UniProtKB/Swiss-Prot annotation:
Family, as annotated: Belongs to the nuclear hormone receptor family. NR1 subfamily.
Classification lineage: Eukaryota, Metazoa, Chordata, Craniata, Vertebrata
Position of the Glycyl lysine isopeptide (Lys-Gly) (interchain with G-Cter in SUMO2) cross-link: 395, 433
Zinc finger (NR C4-type) boundaries: 78-98, 116-140
The species this protein was found in: Rattus norvegicus
Protein name as it appears in the record: Oxysterols receptor LXR-beta
Length: 446
């Protein structure tokens, strides 16, 4: 396997290349304003690590407003400038002026042209918003406006055409002609989503579903890019040394656990951007993440499986065979099911939108342990199930079993999750201690 050096999303203790030891693989997860690494052994507090990485990074509030916008009372104020708000725009309660300003800034790249004559910390109000565009854009982002919610001119044009087509009366049917109307393609999704006829005839994604899919795919891309930039500090895979030596075995184990930490952090970052997740209470957020993380990791592993080489590639170019997994300390009883599941997922041929929707459905599983509001979780899951059903019927209208096959993979993941628990127990018997974040999210009690 290739073994370039790599990096964690959160710096490892020591601010240098990690060594193949237990403490070196522990992530440094800082609270806001905290400058020092947590002391060794600080993993004892319940859910401390998960709570910190769940905190919104760039917002003054604890939770972002997600999902359907609540009804306006008529006296709400813009979160950016304090003027009268007209509704929720780009995920934030704001006025028409700030809505239009944020859209123009994103579409026309205004951030690169704006400048502040002051210190970059101008206070925003209805007067000052016209004086300093840079600080106004900064305040928009601090309030929670999201660039991925802004549609391009082409996407808006397609939506207008689609809306006009929906308002027009349907043309008279001519069965003898054999022609069929194709559903409109979703902006931001592959053209394959509009192909086909037969059972998929007349099915279209709603505007809300299109936006949902765009947001999920964009969020995944953003999280993946962050992981790619985090390579340099992962413990290098040992090359040239005696593969059976104790140091080499420890180094391989450290390498894999650090990749797992990157994956966990990527999953948490993605979950925070899934519409509806931050509406849940903190306890339910933690419960859902603890239960779903390993299953999402396995989905992402399957996504990176190469059926020709029978290897799995993490980040940019970390490629691993079955033997590499075994050399890192994993058991054959866990490795073989991973590769079997990856091959099965490969045969389904999911695209980015389908993977993103399937992961969102997995996150909102109401039957997870310790969930306080299962009915609310189930309600949040339903739109993603409906979007995936419509999307698959549009993409593969002749394959009526595609959607149920996808959902059955979530059942397979439950079995794999149980096998993973046995693997973690086996690692403990081998006296291989997991880093605090992994111990906490997988409920490993030392």
């Amino acid at each position: 396997m290739s073994s370039p050096t790599s990096s964690l999303d959160t710096p490892l203790p020591g601010n240098g290349s990690p060594q193949p030891s237990t403490s070196s693989t522990s992530p440094t997860i800082k609270e806001e304003g905290q400058e020092t690494d947590p002391p060794p052994g600080s993993e004892g507090s319940s859910s401390a690590y998960i709570v910190v990485i769940l905190e919104p990074e760039d917002e003054p509030e604890r939770k972002r407003k997600k999902g359907p916008a609540p009804k306006m009372l008529g006296h709400e104020l813009c979160r950016v400038c304090g003027d009268k708000a007209s509704g929720f725009h780009y995920n934030v309660l704001s006025c028409e002026g700030c809505k239009g300003f944020f859209r123009r800034s994103v579409v026309h790249g205004g951030a690169g042209r704006y400048a502040c004559r002051g210190s970059g910390t101008c206070q925003m109000d209805a007067f000052m918003r016209r004086k300093c565009q840079l600080c106004r854009l900064r305040k928009c982002k601090e309030a929670g406006m999201r660039e991925q919610c802004v549609l391009s001119e082409e996407q808006i044009r397609k939506k207008k055409i689609q809306k006009q087509q929906q308002q027009q009366p349907p043309p008279p049917t001519e069965p003898a002609s054999g022609s069929s109307a194709r559903p409109a393609a979703s902006p931001g999704t592959s053209e394959a989503s509009s192909q086909g006829s037969g059972e998929g005839e007349g099915i279209q994604l709603t505007a809300a579903q299109e936006l949902m899919i765009q947001q999920l795919v964009a969020a995944q891309l953003q999280c993946n890019k962050r992981s790619f930039s985090d390579q340099p500090k992962v413990t290098p895979w040992p090359l040239g040394a005696d593969p059976q030596s104790r140091d080499a075995r420890q180094q391989r184990f450290a390498h894999f656990t650090e990749l797992a930490i990157i994956s966990v952090q990527e999953i948490v970052d993605f979950a925070k951007q899934v519409p509806g997740f931050l509406q849940l209470g903190r306890e339910d957020q933690i419960a859902l993440l603890k239960a779903s993380t390993i299953e999402i990791m396995l989905l992402e592993t399957a996504r990176r499986y190469n059926h020709e080489t029978e290897c799995i590639t993490f980040l940019k170019d970390f490629t691993y065979s079955k033997d590499d997994f075994h050399r890192a300390g994993l058991q054959v009883e866990f490795i073989n099911p991973i590769f079997e599941f990856s091959r099965a997922m490969r045969r389904l041929g999911l695209d980015d939108a389908e993977y993103a929707l399937l992961i969102a459905i997995n996150i909102f599983s109401a039957d997870r342990p310790n969930v306080q509001e299962p009915s609310r979780v189930e309600a949040l899951q339903q739109p993603y199930v409906e979007a995936l059903l419509s999307y698959t019927r549009i993409k593969r209208p002749q394959d009526q079993l595609r959607f149920p096959r996808m959902l059955m993979k979530l059942v397979s993941l439950r079995t794999l999750s149980s096998v993973h628990s046995e693997q973690v127990f086996a690692l403990r018997l081998q006296d291989k201690k997991l880093p605090p974040l992994l111990s906490e999210i997988w409920d490993v009690h030392e």
